[in-house]
Amino acid sequence: MGEVDPAFIQALEHRPKLQTSFAQGIPLIDLSPLINSPEPSQQLVAEIGRACQEWGFFQVINHGVAVKARENIESAARKFFALPKEDKKKVARDEVNPLGYYDTEHTKNVRDWKEVFDFVVRDRSLIPASPDESDDQDQVKELINQWPEFPSDIREVCEEYAAEMQKLADKLLGLIALSLGLERTRFNGFFDDQTTFIRLNHYPPCPAPDLALGVGRHKDAGALTILAQDDVGGLQVKRKTDGEWVLVKPTPDSYIINVGDIIQVWSNDKYESVEHRVKVNSEKERFSIPFFHNPAHYTWVEPLEELVNDQNPAKYKPYNWGKFFSARKRSNFMKLDVENVQIQHFKNHTSLPNTE
């Protein structure tokens, strides 16, 4: 990635400002009470609920994730991305198997300034064979992890890290369920045959950080994202109060938690997924590792019945997660003539009474 190809250049209204402020007041939630007591306090549950409602994301500390597991996967990522391009492309992903290495991903039809390596947490995960709604959703294909020869321990460290992330995700989903007034285990069944995946991100230095983005503006399609970022920083979120893009300052040994679109739908818009993007740096490379927690491909996503009533009717029509996921994956490979599928496409629009 030398000169800036026009494919990377953002439309004028979406270009990042070189000077942006760090966000103030981002919730920083201490999970250490869960270490000593399996039952979370009402205070902790309320903190989680406020963060999901007011920000759509938060940071956690004292989360119980083994420090060594994170250090190992970060080291493996650096070693892998330092390989020659031809070696990385030996495990290149494609439309048939969207796992492995890729360096031409698009977000909202603009190319991202990054390279990635993806693997599923549950090897041989199933997704629909076709993203098209008209095609049979029972026709499925397997997602099979591709592992490079170097670093030699990459599979082992990735699987160890995935197990740590799974434990943290279970804790967080339990807290979010409680904050919505639901049973703590309410979400568990959706993830029995999960399509969760982990991504290793590498953002090389960019000669034109005012024109390109590491990842363009987007919301996460799944249920929950757990992000480990290095000390370089670059993650920006769109603040709900004023619509400004603000930087998330890296906090040592913390994780950033994003509410995804699925939780927005399950909560019937009580919680909202946050729009975010990644700035690039002209001098420093950046690494990050998101864990995208996704349900089984056969899940129909809709507002939960406990949260819907005559006063608060369902704001979304049900949609099939596997089809949604497959369609979003397809858009990563090519520029589309139409906007990529969004949860807004499934909104129930209440018609106004006819006054004529």
Model-derived features: positions:
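Peripheral, non-catalytic segments flanking oxidoreductase cores
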Residues: M1-E356
